[in-house]
């Protein structure tokens, strides 16, 4: 063998070997950190100075390239932990922590999913009167009662989030006016305004949010981890199903052309930013 050629190649080989080892070590670190939510929490508890959104996104992005299933399951676990275990929609708001995760000028009503105008996408069903519809629901409290998820691939996953709520029908003048207009449209099954007077206005409701693979060809990919915008946008179809224990409301949800729209609604072309939930779980 030509010794000069050997001497020439050896430094290059060593450089490539070193570079490859560094990349492997980086990938290994990312995979270990995001292998589970608890692993990520332990890592950032020990490296608090590294807990910024850009770093978290880059770690998850690197982890996704080597173990997509573990990465997505870790993201889903953060989503569940923040909504169900940390109860951000039920407890008094930790303003500092919430702002760090969800951004400035954001509140509980901006959380998706939630029982709110934005969280229920009411503007897409009741254009022009979505605020009044939210007031008709008169949400007094809401609670995440179930959160299940499974992931096999970008074309085979499912997330189901269940909410229980307590509300008061017609909790203001605007909502009362809207109820009157709905009832005047007919097909009410003999339901009248008197059926919602005083204590009869109280009701319990259930909302179930089901996220499934998009039918428009979009897929969750490496590019969805965006450290520049500080987002991890997860594309999915969404179905929202509603039910209530209130007999008269149930009749309206079956018969009234306006009220029954809320019973079951499907949305396509949606993307859901999972980073705020994951980041909140790490804080």
Swiss-Prot record:
Main location: membrane
Domain of life: Bacteria
Membrane topology: Lipid-anchor
Places the protein is found: Cell membrane
Lipidation positions, renumbered (S-diacylglycerol cysteine): 26
Chain residues carrying a lipid of type N-palmitoyl cysteine: 26
UniProt-listed Pfam families: Lipoprotein_3
Annotated signal sequence range: 1-25
Family: Belongs to the MG439/MG440 family.
UniProt-recorded name of the protein: Uncharacterized lipoprotein MG439 homolog 3
Protein source organism: Mycoplasma pneumoniae (strain ATCC 29342 / M129 / Subtype 1)
């Amino acid at each position: 063998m030509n010794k000069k050629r050997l001497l020439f190649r050896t430094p290059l080989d060593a450089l490539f070997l070193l570079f490859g080892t560094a990349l492997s070590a980086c990938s290994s670190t990312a995979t270990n950190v995001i292998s589970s939510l608890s692993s990520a929490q332990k890592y950032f508890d020990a490296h608090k100075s590294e807990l910024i959104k850009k770093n978290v996104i880059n770690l998850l992005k690197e982890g996704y390239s080597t173990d997509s299933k573990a990465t997505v399951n870790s993201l889903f676990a953060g989503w569940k932990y923040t909504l169900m275990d940390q109860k951000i929609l039920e407890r008094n708001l930790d303003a500092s922590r919430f702002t760090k995760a969800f951004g400035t000028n954001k509140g509980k009503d901006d959380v998706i999913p939630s029982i709110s105008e934005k969280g229920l996408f009411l503007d897409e069903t009741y254009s022009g009167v979505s605020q009044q519809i939210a007031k008709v629901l008169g949400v007094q409290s809401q609670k995440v009662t179930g959160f299940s998820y499974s992931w096999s691939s970008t074309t085979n996953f499912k997330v189901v989030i269940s909410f229980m709520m307590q509300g008061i029908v017609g909790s203001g003048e605007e909502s009362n006016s809207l109820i009157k207009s709905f009832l005047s449209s007919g097909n009410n099954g003999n339901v009248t305004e008197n059926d919602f007077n005083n204590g009869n206005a109280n009701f319990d409701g259930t909302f179930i949010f089901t996220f499934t693979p998009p039918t428009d060809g979009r897929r969750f990919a490496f590019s969805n981890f965006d450290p520049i915008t500080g987002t991890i946008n997860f594309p999915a179809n969404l179905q929202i199903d509603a039910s209530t224990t209130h007999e008269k409301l149930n009749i309206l949800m079956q018969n009234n052309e306006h009220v029954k729209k809320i019973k079951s609604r499907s949305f396509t072309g949606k993307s859901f930013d999972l980073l705020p939930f994951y980041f909140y779980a790490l804080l």
